[in-house]
Amino acid sequence: MIGRLFRAHGEFCASHPWEVIVALLTITACMLTVDKNNTLDASSGLGTATASAAAAGGSGSGAGSGASGTIPPSSMGGSATSSRHRPCHGWSQSCDGLEAEYNAADVILMTIVRCTAVLYCYYQFCSLHRLGSKYVLGIAGLFTVFSSFIFTTAIIKFLGSDISELKDALFFLLLVIDLSNSGRLAQLALSGSNQAEVTQNIARGLELLGPAISLDTIVEVLLVGVGTLSGVQRLEVLCMFAVLSVLVNYVVFMTFYPACLSLIFDLSRSGVDMSVVREKAKGSLLLKSLTEEEQKANPVLQRVKLIMTTGLMAVHIYSRVAFSGSDYDAVDKTLTPTLSLNVSNNRTESGEIADIIIKWLTMSADHIVISIVLIALVVKFICFDNRDPLPDQLRQSGPVAIAAKASQTTPIDEEHVEQEKDTENSAAVRTLLFTIEDQSSANASTQTDLLPLRHRLVGPIKPPRPVQECLDILNSTEEGSGPAALSDEEIVSIVHAGGTHCPLHKIESVLDDPERGVRIRRQIIGSRAKMPVGRLDVLPYEHFDYRKVLNACCENVLGYVPIPVGYAGPLLLDGETYYVPMATTEGALVASTNRGCKALSVRGVRSVVEDVGMTRAPCVRFPSVARAAEAKSWIENDENYRVVKTEFDSTSRFGRLKDCHIAMDGPQLYIRFVAITGDAMGMNMVSKGAEMALRRIQLQFPDMQIISLSGNFCCDKKPAAINWIKGRGKRVVTECTISAATLRSVLKTDAKTLVECNKLKNMGGSAMAGSIGGNNAHAANMVTAVFLATGQDPAQNVTSSNCSTAMECWAENSEDLYMTCTMPSLEVGTVGGGTGLPGQSACLEMLGVRGAHATRPGDNAKKLAQIVCATVMAGELSLMAALVNSDLVKSHMRHNRSSIAVNSANNPLNVTVSSCSTIS
């Protein structure tokens, strides 16, 4: 019941973050603006009236009271009570003689408290820093700052204390702030993938942490509050500060902190890649420990706390109520306001700004100690702690393993057998060495004892349950059941059993945990393929958002292959500067393209998208040639074409039929639909529209037989003259003029040499080879590199690499170079397919073309096509210059085989070039 209340409270704070934060700030502002003068005046008036009444009563009762109406000492309830309960309370009033209590013992005690608070706060922040998440560390720092602000406000206004007393009060707040709980809640919140999941995670965290924290707060308040009953003014002040620290920390943690977590996620989801933060949060030890089993309170400890709470409440009730009817209380109520007013009016104000500054800047002994501690901690963090401990551990792992091996006395044969048995256990032990140990050091003795330690920590490994029992758990909808309740070995046994319960190709959706599904699939494939153990270890699979891969990019996933991504640029295109991402494993490609960008950007590249249209060409058959000709004529009729276009356009918001080319081959028709597809590459969009158009044509010609939705007249992912002639995708043309000075300084050549090489190589040589669309040097290199980086279909480089590179001598003296690149079939898009993957999406963002254009659909895809064509021009120019200068082999040797020094000047022909990537 209590847990559900905290869960509801957490949902409210997380779903209404602005309201909670504004309400808390409003309350704080009200505390800051409270006018205590009215309260003081009322209290003074009451005290004066009461004193007058007492004086009148005293004079009327006889001479025993004195003519002045002074109350005798006997009426104050005895010396014992007076000494214990003074009428001046140090936390709310200015008391004479209070400064005298700042003796040597007090200075020593407060110095110890301050140093302890600083060290404890430093320890907590270092613990959070080791998690590797700057977001959690920043949120914890925000929590500390806001708590300090509210605590300071309460000290100054709510308790009426002096500003100078903050030097003692703030250290008590640092002592009670527990950043471990705030770190747990922050990581649990940041593990959510959307706002609704974050809200539920915060509510779940408060449900688990709230009851225990609330009980601890009550116990701490009652326990520390006993000090306020001591009658020792200095102790009462310190205990009151501590009590208020506990309360402020609890209020901020239960209200401001969950609202702040929810708000930070909501504001940062468009500007911060939260997947990195979520992966760090999911992989941390804190989040792994935040489970129901770990957070279940110890019943014995809970009972002890309840007993302590009851006893402490009894102490407080007795101490505060027992003397409520005594004479002391009457006198205290009578005299306290008057004495407080007199002291306040007669004492020298120590809270003036100048006095406070002088007092705080005075370097006493305790100030020197605190300063030394702070400086030492800062130096320690900067010079020693702010390093990644993993390299130190890796450097020590070799000597440690050797020392452990040397310390063994097991015979070699037995050791070999045990090594095979404990392969899996040793892997787990190595993992635990990096996650459990706080120190990065180890020795031989600790290494040899790790296996028993593992069994003590993890517990005995349970054998897999029967398959039928595992199936019942897998299909159960009860809480605590489902795939999460099964071990990896049990999932493997279910897959091996066959059936439709957990097929290997759908294991991610069955487990509802894609990364775990990929891990188990790797185990199964490794076993079925009889691979050596660890063969797939170098193929990464962790820390990847597979939800964006499933049903979009790849099936039967085993992991991912990292490809280096470089950039070429700056590239000045149509007045804008771009840094073009290129993913490749071919050395010198990015460097060569970058050199071309440097030459082109002197005067800039101009581009134009001449035509747009994705194609799909179904193949249909008719009973006779005459019937096929009749159908061709019917489709080409303008009125009938509009009917077909209406059916085609009804399948998509962006797909619009633009043209229809029909080729007849006997009784077969090849109908090539051409459509614009917005910012998508559009093959699936056109296929869907073509299918709907064929259905409409079939209504007019029932004897038409659909042979294939794609009849290779499109033509997709194959060299084809029709794409070279009629185009497919985006038809882009770029041009640029390179000055003679740029040719000499950047490319080390001249215009006439480049023009002659282009004529003989790209035109004559391509014609001799019968190349289709190959009138270029190496356009496919740049096209494929940009395609891989931006999430395009890599296989479409076959069609997209069609390029005609032309060069002419320019200007009056013919020393400048005029260059154009025409690419009639660039198939690119900025939405769909691989463009949604995190890395590829980042590269599109780098170019400013991620996703669909907000106002003009299709503009982002056009801009990407223009960038690709301009990048191809840069690569073409640089390679042509390298060819005429004999720099090609030299550059490839330098970038691909740096250990081989090639001296082309002294020995230009005696070089082995078989290891070069590609020489066009």
From Swiss-Prot:
Pathway: Metabolic intermediate biosynthesis; (R)-mevalonate biosynthesis; (R)-mevalonate from acetyl-CoA: step 3/3. GO terms for molecular function: hydroxymethylglutaryl-CoA reductase (NADPH) activity; NADP binding. It catalyses: (R)-mevalonate + 2 NADP(+) + CoA = (3S)-3-hydroxy-3-methylglutaryl-CoA + 2 NADPH + 2 H(+). The chain crosses the membrane at residues 12-32, 107-129, 136-156, 170-190, 208-228, 237-257, 364-384. The active site is at residues 586, 717, 793, 892. Residues 385-498 are annotated as: Linker. It is a multi-pass membrane protein. Pfam families: HMG-CoA_red, Sterol-sensing. It is found in: Endoplasmic reticulum membrane. It comes from the Eukaryota. Residues 499-829 are annotated as: Catalytic. InterPro entries: HMG_CoA_Rdtase, HMG_CoA_Rdtase_cat_sf, HMG_CoA_Rdtase_CS, HMG_CoA_Rdtase_eu_arc, HMG_CoA_Rdtase_metazoan, HMG_CoA_Rdtase_N, HMG_CoA_Rdtase_NAD(P)-bd_sf, HMG_CoA_Rdtase_sub-bd_dom_sf. It is an enzyme of class 1 (oxidoreductase). CDD domains: HMG-CoA_reductase_classI. Residues 106-263 form the SSD domain. Glycans are attached at residues 37, 342, 346, 443, 475, 797, 802, 896, 910. PROSITE patterns: HMG_COA_REDUCTASE_1 (PS00066), HMG_COA_REDUCTASE_2 (PS00318), HMG_COA_REDUCTASE_3 (PS01192), HMG_COA_REDUCTASE_4 (PS50065), SSD (PS50156). One of its GO terms (biological process) is coenzyme A metabolic process. Keywords: Endoplasmic reticulum, Glycoprotein, Isoprene biosynthesis, Membrane, NADP, Oxidoreductase, Transmembrane, Transmembrane helix. The activity of HMG-CoA-reductase is suppressed by exogenous mevalonate. Residues 71-82 have a biased composition (Polar residues). Its main location: endoplasmic reticulum. Synthesis of mevalonate for the production of non-sterol isoprenoids, which are essential for growth differentiation. Provides spatial information during embryogenesis to guide migrating primordial germ cells (the pole cells) from the ectoderm to the mesoderm. Also required for association of the pole cells with the gonadal mesoderm. Belongs to the HMG-CoA reductase family. This is 3-hydroxy-3-methylglutaryl-coenzyme A reductase. The gene is Hmgcr.
